[in-house]
């Protein structure tokens, strides 16, 4: 084969599965949203901190390395000292490591918030990505459930700060101790029943999806779905199933609290959990948060195994249309709970902790559905065109650009091939530039510049029928002294803003 036939293959540009590139509008929307979240957290007295993207794999807790490679659920690599590191799976486990490592220097209670990307080595799907952003808030070193109540109130305030009205969201609260008490009361206490307890938790977690009848099947012998696939159940008997369904079916906690307390009486943690729920309910009510905002709801079962007490979830209650065209409730956008065991793994002593995570991408989708995000105007930059390439001319163009920027106006000088002026105006049109600044040799000699109102010009171009009329009208273009450049640009931008406002 000749050398001519051996053409080097081009590298194929491809995005890894489960990852997305982010556009300017997405980034601005996230920045707008996180700024509002951050303001609420700051008002509550929380401080920011960051942890690295990589942690030693054993610090993540849920995903310990196997003999060859710790690849279940996390992205991992082996360092040159043969230690395994993984991209963080969430923001909570790295926080626990940070607190344990700096325990003697940290002031407890430690109130902190963090925003950042987390990574899941899982099969991607529609709306399910391997990299996504979370925004967390946590209190470390506060053993009382008043810290959990504060988290619930902060979740409610955050959603309202983002423009979500009361009635469109609900903070639902349960307690893992109560659930564990119910399981103990029906004979599922002890280490030997751990697997069966986990199956019960998974069944309860499907309540919204399958309803009480479907959950009853999953608690009992099992359930066959529409495709014929069979999911083995938890193997409970009818009496056990009735007690579990009573617990998760409680609609009015105040009416059922006494009956629930009776059910878990005599269990190691159940009674304590009921008291904690009652305390949280009293605290949030005293602070002005009624049950239409924060509600005790025993059907909340968060899947992470390290929750040890109160668990809470922020649900958006308005309807949206799913990919099948069906009306469905939007659902959960944030959740968390008490995880007294997570920091303790490093310490050998109890370290109480509670906190929650907001799913930034999911919440952003909800806010866009409500028209609460991305509404702020972002005006494209004014374009200073380039007519001459000599040093003096370039210096003038750059000076015009800097004068506009100094006045707070977005501006850029054209950086492409300046010799094709038509391409500069095409660039301005595609970029959505509101104004083009033009100065050729004649204008430079007179100390003037031409200002082309591209927005008005585009509108009028549809009304003027021929080029002769266009040239005669000289619409949307005027010549001003260099000294008046900034003031005239400001006036044109203000007029364009008025036009947009009238068009709304």
Swiss-Prot record:
GO terms for molecular function: ATP binding; histidine-tRNA ligase activity. Its EC number is 6.1.1.21. It catalyses: tRNA(His) + L-histidine + ATP = L-histidyl-tRNA(His) + AMP + diphosphate + H(+). It comes from the Bacteria. The keyword Magnesium does not apply. PROSITE patterns: AA_TRNA_LIGASE_II. Its main location: cytoplasm. One of its GO terms (cellular component) is cytoplasm. It holds the Pfam family tRNA-synt_His. InterPro entries: aa-tRNA-synth_II, aa-tRNA-synth_II/BPL/LPL, Anticodon-bd, Anticodon-bd_dom_sf, His-tRNA-ligase, HisRS-like_core, HisRS/HisZ, HisRS_anticodon. GO terms for biological process: histidyl-tRNA aminoacylation. Belongs to the class-II aminoacyl-tRNA synthetase family. PANTHER family: HISTIDINE--TRNA LIGASE, HISTIDYL-TRNA SYNTHETASE. NCBIfam families: hisS. This is Histidine--tRNA ligase. It comes from Rhizobium rhizogenes (strain K84 / ATCC BAA-868) (Agrobacterium radiobacter).
């Amino acid at each position: 084969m000749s050398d001519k036939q051996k053409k080097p293959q081009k590298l194929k540009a491809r995005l890894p599965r489960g990852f997305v590139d982010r556009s300017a509008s997405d980034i601005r929307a996230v920045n707008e949203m996180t700024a509002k979240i951050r303001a609420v957290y700051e008002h509550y007295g929380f401080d920011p901190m960051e942890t690295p993207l990589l942690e030693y794999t054993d610090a993540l807790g849920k995903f310990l390395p196997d003999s060859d490679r710790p690849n279940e659920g996390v992205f991992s690599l082996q360092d040159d000292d043969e230690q395994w590191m993984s991209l963080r799976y969430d923001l909570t486990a790295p926080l626990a490591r940070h607190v344990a490592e700096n325990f003697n220097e940290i002031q407890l209670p430690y109130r902190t918030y963090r925003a950042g990307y987390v990574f899941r080595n899982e099969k991607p799907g529609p709306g399910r990505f391997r990299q996504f952003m979370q925004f967390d808030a946590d209190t470390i070193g506060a053993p009382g459930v008043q810290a959990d109540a504060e988290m619930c109130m902060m979740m409610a305030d955050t959603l309202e700060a983002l423009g979500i009205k009361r009635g469109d969201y609900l903070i639902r609260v349960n307690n893992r101790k109560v659930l564990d008490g119910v399981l103990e009361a029906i004979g599922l206490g002890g280490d030997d029943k751990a697997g069966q307890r986990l199956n019960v938790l998974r069944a309860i977690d499907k309540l919204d999806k399958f309803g009480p009848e479907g959950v009853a099947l999953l608690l009992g012998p099992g359930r066959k779905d529409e495709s014929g696939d069979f999911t083995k159940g938890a193997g409970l008997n009818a009496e056990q199933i009735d007690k579990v369904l009573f617990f998760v079916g409680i609609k009015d906690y105040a009416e059922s609290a006494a009956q629930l307390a009776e059910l878990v009486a005599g269990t190691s943690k159940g009674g304590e959990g009921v008291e904690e729920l009652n305390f949280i309910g009293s605290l949030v009510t005293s602070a002005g948060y009624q049950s239409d905002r924060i509600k005790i709801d025993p059907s909340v079962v968060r899947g992470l195994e390290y929750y040890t007490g109160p668990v809470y979830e922020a649900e958006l209650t308005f309807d949206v249309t799913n990919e099948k065209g069906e009306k469905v409730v939007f659902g959960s956008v944030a959740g968390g709970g008490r995880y007294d065991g997570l920091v303790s793994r490093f310490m050998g002593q109890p370290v109480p902790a509670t906190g929650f995570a907001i799913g930034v991408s999911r919440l952003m989708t909800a806010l866009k559905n409500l028209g609460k995000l991305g509404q702020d105007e972002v005006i494209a930059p004014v374009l200073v065109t380039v007519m001459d390439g000599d040093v003096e001319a370039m210096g003038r163009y750059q000076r015009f650009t800097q004068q506009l920027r100094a006045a707070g106006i977005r501006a850029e000088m054209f950086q492409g091939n300046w010799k094709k002026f038509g391409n500069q105006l095409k660039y301005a049109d595609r970029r959505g530039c509101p104004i083009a600044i033009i100065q050729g040799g004649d204008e430079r000699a007179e100390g003037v510049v031409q200002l082309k109102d591209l927005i008005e010009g585009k509108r009028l171009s549809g009304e003027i029928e021929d080029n002769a009329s266009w040239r005669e009208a000289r619409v949307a273009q005027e010549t001003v002294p260099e000294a008046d450049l900034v003031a005239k640009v400001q006036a044109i931008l203000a007029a364009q803003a008025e036009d947009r406002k009238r068009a709304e």
